[in-house]
Amino acid sequence: MIWKLSERKDWNSLEQQFGWVRDMNQVPQHTVHHAEGSVAVHTRMVFEALLRQPAYLMLPEQEREILWAAALLHDVEKRSTSVDEGNGQVTSKNHAKRGETTVRTLLYRDIPAPFNIREHIASLVRHHGLPIWLMEREDPLKRACEASLRLDTSLLKQLTVADICGRISTDKEVLLEATEFFEMFCREQQCWGKAREFANGTARFHYFHTPRSYIDYVPHDDFKCGVTLLVGLPGM
């Protein structure tokens, strides 16, 4: 059975069904980076951009539903994080992080989704900006591999491309180029469309919890120990 956030996907129906969709109409955005207007206008444009992607149309139905839901929800918490700094500058720091929590709650309480689907959508919302800024941050390899353990990086790129194309701004070409670098990097690091593999659980734990660690390092397994067992019989 295919899970769907909603059978009715036209915008008017979505507004009637969900208060958080209606809220998007009241949330302004940065007039330079999002000259199209409110979050509602942007999200509708993201839908249109997503439907223009051949890769999206070729996905299995369940993956299309996951990506569609992530597109609808990717900016849901701009409503709680947006701050008007004046002169058309609107910031929304941590909207993706807060959105992840909202999505997880929503898909648990209001629109129940299977665990793996819920977590995939929540992770896509959390990381929807990752392909844009990955190469500018400290330790991009660790960030990419960590994301690959939570989501499909090829779906993440599709979401980010739709997010970029679904806006009016002057830097779209630069942002789209960043998503291409993201794909190249993930392919090179063996985490494109799949989770990055490690030799074992200990190696994975060591890599993510040790600063400046080598990704293919396999720690010596020193968890074994000797046991001396004393057994006594009653009355002996």
Model regions: which residues?
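Acidic/His-rich, divalent-metal-binding segments that scaffold phosphate/diphosphate chemistry
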Residues: 1-85
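Short, well-structured alpha-helical interface segments that form or flank functional binding sites
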Residues: 41, 120, 225-228
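Interdomain "pre-motor" coupling segment immediately N-terminal to P-loop NTPase/helicase cores
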Residues: 157-199
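Conserved hydrophobic/aromatic pocket- or pore-lining residues that grip, position, or stack substrates
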Residues: 46, 99, 233
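Exposed alpha-helical structural elements
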Residues: 10-16, 20-23, 45, 116, ...
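Glycine-rich phosphate-binding loop of ATP-dependent small-molecule kinases
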Residues: 187-236
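Divalent metal-dependent catalytic cores for phosphoryl transfer on phosphate-bearing substrates
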Residues: 51-175
